[in-house]
UniProtKB/Swiss-Prot annotation:
Source organism: Arabidopsis thaliana (Mouse-ear cress)
Example GO BP: response to auxin
Gene3D superfamilies referenced in this protein's UniProt entry, alphabetically: EF-hand
Official protein name in the record: Calcium-binding protein KRP1
Keyword Metal-binding: yes
Xref: Pfam families: EF-hand_8
Residues that coordinate or bind Ca(2+): D85, D87, D89, E96
Name of the encoding gene: KRP1
Keyword Calcium set for record: yes
Length: 130
């Protein structure tokens, strides 16, 4: 697995980049509130200080400086912004950023799905059919 500082970019031979999802580990160690706090800290590292949101320019600049991802193309940065930009304003606010981080974590999404399913089953008396 690649470290967070050196993700492997997709190639024809390897269409999927190597990626290790650290969010479940962070959630386990920090708890829910601690994880959200850390995501908010990450947001602040990437945001444009004057606008209070992550813009194309701030992500481009800070991804290189803070995360060591200087090899991102403009298209990579545009896609990253577009992926989480729910209100279509061309930037990520703090809520959009945190939601995006959860959506991009397969393990956290699966755990959330299981939790919601369990609550629904308990609330409405449903049982799983195999």
């Amino acid at each position: 697995m690649a470290s967070p500082k050196s993700p492997t970019r997709p190639t024809q031979q390897n269409p999927q980049p190597n990626f290790h999802d650290f969010l479940p580990t962070m959630a386990g160690n920090l708890g829910g509130e601690g994880l959200i706090g850390e995501l908010c800290n990450g947001f602040e590292l990437l945001m444009d200080r004057e606008k209070g949101v992550i813009t194309f320019e701030s992500l481009r600049r800070n991804a290189a400086a803070v995360l060591g991802l200087g090899d991102l193309t403009d298209e990579d940065v545009r896609c990253m912004i577009k992926e989480g930009d729910f209100d279509c304003d061309g930037a990520l606010n703090q809520m959009e950023f945190c939601v995006l981080m959860f959506r991009l974590s397969p393990d956290l999404m699966e755990a959330s799905r299981c939790l919601v399913t369990e609550v629904i089953e308990e609330e409405f008396g449903f049982t799983r059919r195999h």
